[in-house]
Amino acid sequence: MAGSGAWKRLKSMLRKDDAPLFLNDTSAFDFSDEAGDEGLSRFNKLRVVVADDGSEAPERPVNGAHPTLQADDDSLLDQDLPLTNSQLSLKVDSCDNCSKQREILKQRKVKARLTIAAVLYLLFMIGELVGGYIANSLAIMTDALHMLTDLSAIILTLLALWLSSKSPTKRFTFGFHRLEVLSAMISVLLVYILMGFLLYEAVQRTIHMNYEINGDIMLITAAVGVAVNVIMGFLLNQSGHRHSHSHSLPSNSPTRGSGCERNHGQDSLAVRAAFVHALGDLVQSVGVLIAAYIIRFKPEYKIADPICTYVFSLLVAFTTFRIIWDTVVIILEGVPSHLNVDYIKEALMKIEDVYSVEDLNIWSLTSGKSTAIVHIQLIPGSSSKWEEVQSKANHLLLNTFGMYRCTIQLQSYRQEVDRTCANCQSSSP
């Protein structure tokens, strides 16, 4: 340290002018041989050189700012030097390149969870039907019926994920997305038929009261049902799997906040919906367990069994009504409930060089896949800008409003000339 200080004082005394010291970034960093000749400590990879010749110095700005050093490839550190964490964080993978692979992995995890849930639902639904039949309990069988609705929903979700990877054919140019809607209609109709049969039996038991229930089997089956639904809740719960991976960027980076920060553990709506259904099943199973406990220890209150059937039938009807309504809207090619046609028209009219929006038709191929056909008239004299208008309208429909497909027809505005139909003239008095 003493030798280094003496060297600095000697260099200051020998300076020809009062110009400030500067770093010479035009020389290579590896000067270990020169350092040894001058008696300085050797640097393995880097040595800062103090230049005396003012001609080598960068031009000093008049405003007193720090001089800007020009980039020089020769001034980089040797490759075997370890990089710091901040240097490593600047190497960012493009989110656009990995988003497709990430989506595939996400769908694979969703399919695995839903498949396991479907298998458990199927096995226990069969077990409940057998247990309810042996125990002569309509409440147990109604609980199995409610589980059938959840099983159908999971199967439809898996079907939708499978169909999304299928390409359209020459006959089915839109693909096979409507198959999901058809399957939903069939499954709901099957549930309603079974529910009608159970309600009829419940009414007969309420009127005649000539039936016996095996309280032990009913209690065991109901207890297993609660346990299975708790397991389903843990299986489908995603709160413990949320973790955000963000690509590290410096705070002043122009790309920060521009979409490179993603939540890689984003929840799946399909799994979340199945989790909500599992919670509903858990509540219903607890109700069946309470009824089984009452019937087991108080057989004279066996009326609790048909009462549970009435309550759970209403619950099944309530949960399936939305499916029926959405299916009818899709079949009739109605506008999806989350889209507003007037608002979309206003947004299209705000595009530059758009004169009017003549036709706007919106419908759904299936749940979550909306399609639009729009006819736009351009301002007279702006036909040369049709590509720009089409690009903006396409981006608005697909990205802003989340359309699955859209078709845009462009036409220059032409004032209509009143023409009287010859048939109308001949028929008029």
UniProtKB/Swiss-Prot annotation:
Q: How is it modified after translation?
A: Homodimerization through dityrosine bonds is stimulated by oxidative stress.
> Which residues make up the binding site for Zn(2+)?
146, 150, 277, 281
- Transmembrane spans: 114-134, 144-164, 179-199, 217-237, 275-295, 311-331
Q: Provide Cytoplasmic-side residue ranges.
A: 1-113, 165-178, 238-274, 332-429
User: Per the record, which residues fall in region Zinc binding?
Assistant: 240-264
Predominant subcellular localization, coarse grouping: membrane
**Keywords, ordered alphabetically:** Antiport, Endosome, Ion transport, Lysosome, Membrane, Metal-binding, Transmembrane, Transmembrane helix, Transport, Zinc, Zinc transport
Q: Which Pfam families match?
A: Cation_efflux (PF01545)
- SUPFAM superfamilies named in the record: Cation efflux protein cytoplasmic domain-like, Cation efflux protein transmembrane domain-like
InterPro entries tied to this protein: Cation_efflux (IPR002524), Cation_efflux_CTD_sf (IPR036837), Cation_efflux_TMD_sf (IPR027469), CDF/SLC30A (IPR050681)
The UniProt entry's GO biological process terms, in alphabetical order, are: response to toxic substance; response to zinc ion; zinc export across plasma membrane; zinc ion import into lysosome; zinc ion transmembrane transport
Reaction(s) catalysed (UniProt annotation): Zn(2+)(in) + 2 H(+)(out) = Zn(2+)(out) + 2 H(+)(in)
Q: How does it sit in the membrane?
A: Multi-pass membrane protein
Q: Which GO terms describe its molecular function?
A: antiporter activity; metal ion binding; zinc ion transmembrane transporter activity
Per the record, GO CC terms?
cytoplasm; endosome membrane; late endosome; late endosome membrane; lysosomal membrane; plasma membrane
Q: What does this protein do?
A: Probable proton-coupled zinc ion antiporter mediating zinc import from cytoplasm potentially into the endocytic compartment. Controls zinc deposition in milk.
**Oligomeric and partner information:** Homodimer; dityrosine-linked. Homodimerization could be specific of the human protein and enhances the zinc transport efficiency. Interacts with TMEM163.
Entry's family note:
Belongs to the cation diffusion facilitator (CDF) transporter (TC 2.A.4) family. SLC30A subfamily.
Q: State the protein's name.
A: Probable proton-coupled zinc antiporter SLC30A4
Its organism's taxonomic lineage begins at: Eukaryota, Metazoa, Chordata, Craniata, Vertebrata
- Gene (name only): SLC30A4
